[in-house]
Regions:
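Proline-centered turn/helix-capping motifs that create local helix->coil transitions or kinks
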Residues: 36-37, 99-109, 151-152, 193-197, ...
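Catalytic-core region of carbohydrate-active enzymes that cleave or remodel glycosidic bonds
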Residues: 254-275, 298-350, 361
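Well-ordered alpha-helical scaffold segments within catalytic/enzyme domains
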Residues: 16-18, 68-84, 134-148, 181-193, ...
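Low-complexity, Ser/Thr/Pro/Gly-enriched N-terminal "stalk/linker" regions
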Residues: 1-65, 91-112
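Beta-strand-rich binding/interaction modules
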Residues: 448-468
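Extended ligand-binding groove/face enriched in aromatic
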Residues: 48-61, 77-176, 183-215, 223-225
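Solvent-exposed loop and edge beta-strand segments that line ligand/cofactor-binding
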Residues: 48-66, 82, 118-133, 165-178, ...
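C-terminal beta-rich recognition modules with glycine/proline-rich loops and embedded aromatic residues
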Residues: 201, 265, 331-339, 344-442, ...
């Protein structure tokens, strides 16, 4: 499948547009203030003026948080409603980078700092120098495309050229401890046409898996450096690293057509979706090493599901869609977007989750903390703040992932109020998705030749309807004709609440059900249930009978659940030293009484008082 032609897409209303407005109004100004407070700018400034003070921060890769923010700003500062102070911040950082860059092109505020014990390129396993470069390149390409500002691109190319000279085909065979530069180098090739960057990206993909990083404090599997990429049997290791590496490999395939890469990517993707991805689209089940677990190892309350891993999964999904045209990749993209990604940001746009569990215990506040199950509620910033600026840049770019045009076909994959132009065809998309399942396309301008409009039918939409009548092929509803201004294409998706079961191998949720409506996963917070959430018993029938109600501009689900009696806490007491050798003989559990319960979209949980939460609820049994 070809890359496709250029298209112009703008969000004009609805939930995603509201998220972008919040990003401009609240999240970006908040991030700028936090970056200033944390010392990210001062770390660059002190390279020219050591009197500024010592290096600020614990990690050697903090420049990346500036780069990700700059990438988001490249999309925002040119808008009429640009965030306050955004342009001044953008210009200030670019000027600092110009001043800080070494004569040979190297740029890293930590390793250039004369007070640091490590020298450039001395710690590729943990120094993240190429990872930083990757985010610099992505910011530079965005600025060149969106702002016609080539200053960052000049900086990025100087650094990238140094890497090609040092680690190219005739250079030292190394890889970075954190994949990211691979997809950035491919994007730099697309922007400049310089094939050296594409060659370098392919080299980095091909070199991984040769044990280059085994000497570090983490095993090779953590870095995906234990097995060559094409031979990986399963997604493994650090979740963000894994998905970034796969996205980079997908980019290399897109430009080279390497079938061995695509075969590996499809195998790894299918394994991940079938056995290692949470219902929310979250990736990474272990707090230890922020890692992907074994097949079906998907604990709810200990889920790590890092917000950055959600973004990396969307990056991989988008590239797989572009490589194959298959709707299943956008199904996962959409699930991640509305759940595992969106939950990472508070409703007011100024606080963040790093990890995203599917359950919180009632007593969690007594033991909360990053080293013991993650944060209870979102935080304003982090010592390693990779997630907040990642959220910002992805939010700024959402319109670029609504559709793709190729071979006179407009593929509309993510639904939102928007206006899209491609191949002389302009359509206005009107919808209240994901709250409502009706998507209406009105043709505003059309060429005299035949065109095809393909609308994605999500896998959960078993009774979708399209008018005028078209064919449904491999997850797409397709209408082909010579369109004229005023023509309307309408897709209707079923939006009844659904009860989801779980694979029996997932011990952590066996015998439980979860609730979804459209692409949204729902959960119950303790403040919305008249009984302890751990004692609620839910049946599929109760889910199907749920009432949909608007609350604070979102749709919630009201339903009735039964309550276990005796409560689980009484039925299964904590075993003490006096009872360890005694068999537990308790009266049989029964269900008694019914209580009203309100389920809220998972992405909204944690915005109120810190109480218990569950996605997976115990199944009502026959008594």
């Amino acid at each position: 499948m070809s890359h496709g032609t250029e298209l112009d897409a703008q969000l004009t209303g609805g939930l995603l547009h509201g998220w972008q407005e919040r990003n401009r109004r609240a999240t970006i100004p908040h991030a700028i203030a936090e970056l200033r407070k944390a010392g990210n700018l001062e770390n660059l400034r002190r390279l020219a003026d050591p009197s500024v003070g010592p290096y600020r921060g614990r990690y050697p890769f903090l420049d990346t948080d500036l780069y990700k923010t700059l990438e988001g700003l490249a999309y925002e500062v040119g808008r009429d409603d640009a965030p306050a102070g955004a342009r001044a911040f953008y210009d200030e950082v670019v000027e600092l980078l110009e001043q800080a860059q070494a004569e040979d092109g190297y740029l890293n505020s930590y390793f250039q700092d004369p007070d640091q014990p490590k020298q450039p390129w001395s710690d590729l396993g943990w120094g993240h120098e190429l990872y930083n470069l990757g985010h610099l390149i992505q910011a530079a390409v965005a600025a060149n495309r969106r702002l016609s500002d080539g200053r960052l691109l000049t900086i990025a190319r100087r650094f990238a050229d140094l890497v090609v000279r040092t680690y190219g085909a005739d250079g030292e065979e190394v890889v970075d401890g954190h994949p990211e530069v691979e997809m950035a180098l491919v994007e730099l090739y697309r922007e400049t046409g310089d094939e050296d960057y594409l060659t370098q990206a392919r080299l980095f993909v091909d070199r991984r898996g040769r044990g280059k990083l085994e000497h570090t404090i983490f095993p090779g599997e953590y870095f995906q450096d234990h097995v060559p990429f094409r031979e990986l049997p399963s997604v493994t290791g650090h979740a963000v690293r894994m998905a970034y590496l796969a996205a980079g490999a997908a980019d290399v395939h897109l430009e080279t057509g390497d079938p061995t890469l695509l075969a590996a990517l499809e195998r790894l993707w299918d394994d991940m979706v079938a056995t290692k991805l949470y219902l929310t689209g979250g990736l990474g089940s272990r707090h230890s090493d922020e890692a992907i677990g074994d097949r079906y190892e998907l604990p709810s309350e200990r889920a790590y599901a890092e917000t950055c891993a959600a973004i990396a999964t969307m990056q991989w999904a988008w590239r797989m869609f572009r490589a194959t045209g298959r709707a299943k990749y956008l199904d996962v993209y959409e699930t991640v977007l509305y759940n595992a990604y969106a939950v990472g940001l508070s409703a007011d746009g100024t606080a963040f989750f790093y990890d995203n569990p599917l359950q919180r215990r009632p007593d969690h506040e007594q033991r909360s903390g990053a080293e013991d199950g993650g944060e209870l509620l979102r935080r304003a910033w982090f010592g390693c703040p990779c997630c907040p600026p990642n959220i910002i840049r992805w939010m700024s770019e959402l319109q670029d992932h609504l559709a793709v045009a190729r071979d006179n076909v407009l593929y509309l994959g993510i639904y939102a109020d928007a206006r899209i132009t491609a191949n002389d065809l302009t359509v206005k998309v009107s919808t209240n998705y994901p709250w409502d399942g009706e998507i209406t396309l009105t043709v505003e301008n059309a060429p005299p030749e035949e065109r095809t409009i393909a609308l994605r039918v999500p896998a959960w939409a078993t009774e979708a309807n399209i008018t005028p009548a078209g064919e449904q092929v491999d997850g797409w509803a397709v209408v082909r004709r010579t369109f004229a201004a005023g023509d309307v294409v309408r897709l209707t998706l079923p939006m009844a609440p659904r009860a989801h079961g779980v694979h029996p191998y997932v011990d952590a949720a066996r015998g439980a059900i979860a609730v979804a409506r459209g692409p949204l996963v729902y959960c119950v917070e303790q403040q919305d249930a008249a009984a302890p959430v751990d004692d609620l018993l839910l049946s599929p029938a109760a889910v199907h009978a749920a009432t949909v109600r608007e609350q604070d501009e979102h749709l919630v689900l009201d339903l009735t659940a039964k309550v276990a009696h005796p409560p689980a806490a009484e039925l299964y007491p904590v075993i003490s030293e006096q009872t360890t050798q005694q068999p537990i003989q308790q009266p049989a559990e029964s269900a008694v009484g019914e209580v009203p319960v309100t389920l809220v979209p998972y992405f909204l949980w944690g915005n109120r008082q810190a109480l218990a939460m569950r996605v997976w609820l115990r199944t009502e049994r026959e008594y």
